[in-house]
Curated annotation (Swiss-Prot):
Recorded family membership: Belongs to the IlvD/Edd family.
Cross-referenced Pfam families: ILV_EDD_C (PF24877), ILVD_EDD_N (PF00920)
UniProt: Mg(2+) binding residues: 80, 122-123, 447
Name this polypeptide is given: Dihydroxy-acid dehydratase
GO cellular component: cytosol
The keyword Magnesium is assigned to this record: yes
Organism: Chlorobaculum parvum (strain DSM 263 / NCIMB 8327) (Chlorobium vibrioforme subsp. thiosulfatophilum)
Superkingdom of origin organism: Bacteria
GO BP field: isoleucine biosynthetic process; L-valine biosynthetic process
HAMAP family the UniProt entry points to: IlvD
């Protein structure tokens, strides 16, 4: 065992003395058992994580019952909703790398034999996965579970995005401040990851398709008693995975990545999942090109539409309809789409995991013969504005905006864009351009939920598009194109756009372009001053110097 490095032999007496002092060692027999890290992300700032302390306790009990010795440790976490719309959002994506580094550090420093990872929200799940793949010790994931949707006294179903969009409605006088307060107080009714197919729930669902989590991980509600049982079952599996030396890199493959992307496309997951899955592939040293997503999308039907793409369906409805296993079972009917032989942490193949699954509500999970669309709910757009690609959540775009041409309204930061939208500078037909908000320019590639919600709230969702080198919340909806690469800070073409330039977005054609010739773009970029970093000290200054492009997952470079 790896942990023998810190516990075996007379020369390790000091190490054993320290281990005994933790209280985790009951008898000397424990030194012959595998040491299992319980990587928890409990904190009291994130509603999706406020309940994880109890799940950690359940996991530790299950590991002991299975014959292991558990050691719980924590990672940090950022609530994207609370960090939204101010300087705090610059730390959100950057926190993913801190989490990956912290997992690597604890596992390697203490020679742990295996890991039970308990994440829940946006950057925590991919961060833990990146760290686990880096160390390549046996691992199993079990999330904290989704929040239930809220309900107003009038019976209207609401979620966090309802609150964000209500701010825009209040600014136009469509609703009163009292009505806004009602939505505010009902939008997030309890613990759990926010209740739509936003980034957190998307990633926790993808864990099932990747093979790293038990069925139910992505959809069983946080407050459902079955969540505690799932934690117990998952933690109970880790000792067997350690004993059989089942490592994450033996589970993650190109095939399992394609399975996860197919699921993502079929349920219209967050655009952030592309960013995170590319980063996960990078840690596993798997080659996956941005452009492959369009090829996969062409044969993946969009069969499960969940908030924010609709206000009628939330994650709890997906769970009731059969969960992720039912979606995968339906997708397995498309010849050659899924690799059902992919291994998983259950000890069975993906095909075996979903063999008994069935769709229990066709209003939530459609058949592949009658999808919402024949192609997936995400797409990569290329063109002279995004030579290296950009991403759009097609499933959340209204039919009238699938093709759009309009004049650019350019803002060099998100705050200016929000002000422009709220004060009426943005008009019907415009294409809002928010730049210098990419991985390096932001820094941290902040999410644009506030401006997209303002656009929707002010009734412009069917007439205004938004493009950015930043990214979007999983809760964003509308004609929102993000991850534009190269970013403005790297002198990408988006830096050449001026207010009034005509921009065409053609989602079915997978293109996005500005009506400028190459020479004009080149001349405008040459005339620009060198990019001046916004933050010059602390973690974000270091992050900005090391981060790579969005089209490769915005991972940190190790080439110096």
């Amino acid at each position: 065992m790896r942990s023998d490095t810190i516990k075996k032999g007379f020369e390790k007496a000091p190490h054993r003395s320290l281990l005994k002092a933790t209280g985790a060692i009951s008898t000397r027999d424990d030194y012959s058992k595998p040491f299992i890290g319980i990587c928890n992300s409990f904190n009291e700032l994130i509603p999706g994580h406020a309940h994880l302390q109890e799940l950690g306790r359940i996991a530790k009990e299950a590991v002991r019952e299975a014959g292991g010795v558990p050691f719980e440790f924590n990672t940090i976490g950022v609530c994207d909703g609370i960090a939204m719309g101010h300087v705090g959002m610059r730390y959100s994506l950057a926190s993913r790398e801190l989490i990956a580094d912290s997992v690597e550090t604890v596992v390697e420093a203490h020679r742990l034999d295996g890991l039970v990872c308990i994440p829940n929200c946006d950057k925590i799940t991919p961060g833990m996965m990146m760290g686990a793949l880096r160390t390549n010790v046996p691992v199993i994931f079990v999330s904290g579970g989704p929040m239930s949707a809220g309900h107003t006294p009038s019976g209207k179903t609401v979620d966090l995005i309802s609150v964000f969009e209500a701010v825009g409605q209040c600014s136009t006088g469509e609703i009163t401040e009292d009505e806004l307060q009602t939505i505010e107080e009902c939008g997030c009714p309890g613990c759990g990851s926010c209740s739509g197919m936003f980034t957190a729930n998307s990633m926790n669902c993808l864990c099932e398709a990747l093979g790293f989590a038990l069925p139910g991980n992505g959809t069983i509600l946080a407050a459902d008693p079955r969540r505690n049982e799932l934690v117990k079952a998952a933690a109970g599996r880790i000792v067997d995975l350690v004993n059989k030396d089942v490592r994450p890199r033996s589970i993650l493959s190109r095939q399992s990545m394609l399975n996860a992307f197919a699921l993502d496309l079929a349920m219209g997951g967050s655009t952030n999942t592309i960013l995170h899955t590319l980063a996960i592939a990078s840690e596993a040293e798997l080659e996956f090109d941005f452009s492959e997503l369009n090829d996969l999308s062409a044969k993946t039907p969009y069969i499960c539409k969940v908030s924010p793409a609709t206000t009628e369906v939330h994650i709890e409805d997906v769970d009731r309809a059969g969960g992720i296993s039912a979606i995968l079972k339906e997708l397995s009917k498309v010849e050659g789409l899924l690799d059902l032989s992919a291994p998983t942490v259950t000890g069975k193949t993906l095909g075996e995991n979903i063999a008994d699954a069935e769709v229990l509500d066709r209003s939530v999970i459609r058949s592949v013969e009658e999808p919402y669309s024949a192609t997936g709910g995400l797409a990569v757009l290329y063109g002279n504005l995004a030579p290296n690609g950009s991403v759009v959540k097609t499933g959340a775009v209204s039919p009238s905006m699938m093709k759009h041409t309009g004049p650019a309204k350019v803002y060099d930061c998100q705050d200016d864009a929000i002000a422009g939208i709220m004060n009426g500078d943005v008009k019907s037909g415009d294409v809002v351009v928010i730049r210098y908000e990419g991985p390096r320019g932001g820094p941290g590639m902040p999410e644009m939920l506030s401006p997209t919600s303002a656009i929707m709230g002010r009734g412009l969702g069917d007439s205004v598009a938004l493009i950015t080198d930043g990214r979007f919340s999983g809760g964003s909806r509308g004609a929102c194109v993000g991850h534009v690469s190269p970013e403005a800070a790297d002198r990408g073409p988006i830096a050449a756009v001026q207010t009034g330039d005509m921009i065409t977005i053609d989602i079915p054609g997978r293109t996005m372009s500005v009506a400028l010739d190459d020479e004009t773009i080149r001349q405008r970029i040459e005339a620009l001053p060198e990019f001046e970093p916004k933050i010059k000290k602390g973690y974000l200054a270091r992050y900005a110097r090391m981060v790579t492009s969005a089209n490769t997952g915005a991972v940190l470079t190790t080439n110096f």
